[in-house]
Curated annotation (Swiss-Prot):
Localisation per UniProt entry: Cytoplasm
Example GO BP: maturation of SSU-rRNA
InterPro entries from the UniProt entry: KH_dom-like_a/b, RbfA, RbfA_dom_sf, Ribosome-bd_factorA_CS
Superkingdom to which the source organism belongs: Bacteria
A molecular-function term among this protein's GO annotations: ribosomal small subunit binding
Record-stated family: Belongs to the RbfA family.
Nucleotide-binding is among the record's keywords: no
This protein's name: Ribosome-binding factor A
Function comment: One of several proteins that assist in the late maturation steps of the functional core of the 30S ribosomal subunit. Associates with free 30S ribosomal subunits (but not with 30S subunits that are part of 70S ribosomes or polysomes). Required for efficient processing of 16S rRNA. May interact with the 5'-terminal helix region of 16S rRNA.
Keyword check for Cytoplasm: yes
PANTHER family: RIBOSOME-BINDING FACTOR A, CHLOROPLASTIC-RELATED
Subunit text: Monomer. Binds 30S ribosomal subunits, but not 50S ribosomal subunits or 70S ribosomes.
Protein's organism: Photorhabdus laumondii subsp. laumondii (strain DSM 15139 / CIP 105565 / TT01) (Photorhabdus luminescens subsp. laumondii)
Key words of the record: Cytoplasm, Ribosome biogenesis
Amino acid sequence: MAREFSRTQRVAQEMQKEIAIILQREVKDPRIGMATVSGVEVSRDLAYAKVFVTFLNVLTEEHDSDVVKNGIKALNEASGFIRSLLGKAMRLRVVPELTFSYDNSLVEGMRMSNLVTNVVKNDEQRRASTDHKEEK
């Protein structure tokens, strides 16, 4: 009977949970701020892991590339510390080497949602104005 998820996917899910907890509770770097782990990709041999993060302060402010660059730089500098805490939290023979990347899918999703909302509003206004003209 085949398993529903491969081992790498299960390890990636568990790593995502543990790294999120570590970032919330243990990492005190102010450059990181409110970082959210949106996904983890683990290599087949579990030697490398790419961690995708978003920053909540970027969502509330204008998309600021300096905040993102500084946050990713700080996370990559703290990757050894995060890796050591991850090794204590998870039972793995080899703890993967971590690299952090910015995940802009949430920002892009919000931008697309705003575009759709604006198009719907403009369409409703256009319909209302044409209906108003036809009544006259």
